[in-house]
């Protein structure tokens, strides 16, 4: 009995040494990870509101067939308001976001993360963007790879071209964990980078965001779906906090 007790105490002391983690501790960390939750119930705008506003921007977004849909040309034209992005009512820090999206012809949109609301300024002035784009249409108009689907817009080009044909559903996985970010498109990791790294700072200085000091500096923020005056469909929006 005494030998078993000594063996137990020795094993316990090893697990408590600096740099060591116990099996129980690992199990607790795994069990404490939050389960994925739906950010969109498919029926109501619960959990969402307009950027820099309090209510759901029904003139710019609609809900049909279990989908969130940006309304084409809403707010476009001389003398009319800018299109309104849709943002979560809660802020998030570290998470995995997954969703499905479908582009229409000439569609342009994005998923912005760690969004901060800037008075009288758009969401993209402060937040990185997972670009969603009808690539063939805009490639013909001269846009660059760093502006195509899957890219961290104007910062990191997508490494692979895996966007499906216009009108097909695509799947996004976005990992934001501390300063580490991953963009996944249709099961392929197309972008990986570190916010605030030396490489990131060099790209930032050469980007269109260089004159926006808030860009990419937030440790937490809202998640936004961009309305860029084109019709884009979103569904199955799930988030797991890390």
Residue ranges, per PLM feature:
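Bacterial Sec-dependent N-terminal signal peptides
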Residues: 1-30
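Carbohydrate-interacting regions of secretory-pathway proteins
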Residues: 21-242
